[in-house]
């Protein structure tokens, strides 16, 4: 019985104390205005949960920073969007996460909104395979 209780407590501790922020494969819609359509690209990004709390009493002397699962390291890859007109710039550079961590969302490089457009949003509505 004690081993069952220990396993239960260990699992609870792991769920609360350990972050599950990790690399995951996603598909994003890539669009170039000059081309007039979107293509799908597979890339790697960060997803998961981070320990956070929302205090009832907001202390103005201590900022309340909500941590989110975000990239720690990035590389950039470039792809050629097929089917663009010859005069159009058909190269598209996009970020690929190589390491993740729980930290403050950097609004200079990341969409930190609660409900963004999402990675598969295409403003043209036309998705090429």
Swiss-Prot record:
Transmembrane segments: none annotated. Keywords: Disulfide bond, Glycoprotein, Hormone, Secreted, Signal. Disulfide bonds join 21-69, 35-84, 38-122, 46-100, 50-102, 105-112. GO terms for molecular function: follicle-stimulating hormone activity. It is found in: Secreted. Glycans are attached at residues 25, 42. Pfam families: Cys_knot. One of its GO terms (biological process) is follicle-stimulating hormone signaling pathway. The keyword Hydrolase does not apply. Heterodimer. The active follitropin is a heterodimer composed of an alpha chain/CGA shared with other hormones and a unique beta chain/FSHB shown here. Together with the alpha chain CGA constitutes follitropin, the follicle-stimulating hormone, and provides its biological specificity to the hormone heterodimer. Binds FSHR, a G protein-coupled receptor, on target cells to activate downstream signaling pathways. Follitropin is involved in follicle development and spermatogenesis in reproductive organs. Belongs to the glycoprotein hormones subunit beta family. This is Follitropin subunit beta. It comes from Equus caballus.
């Amino acid at each position: 019985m004690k081993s069952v209780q220990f396993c239960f407590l260990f699992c609870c501790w792991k769920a609360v104390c350990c972050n599950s922020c990790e690399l995951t494969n996603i598909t994003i819609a890539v669009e170039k205005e000059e081309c007039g359509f979107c293509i799908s690209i597979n890339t790697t990004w960060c997803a998961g949960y981070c320990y956070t709390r929302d205090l009832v009493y907001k202390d103005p002397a201590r900022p309340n920073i909500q941590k989110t699962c975000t990239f720690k390291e990035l590389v950039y890859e470039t792809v050629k969007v097929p089917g663009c007109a010859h005069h159009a710039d058909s190269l598209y550079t996009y970020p690929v996460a190589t390491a993740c961590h729980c930290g403050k969302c950097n609004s200079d490089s990341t969409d930190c909104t609660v409900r963004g457009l999402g990675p598969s949003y295409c403003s043209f509505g036309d998705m090429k395979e």
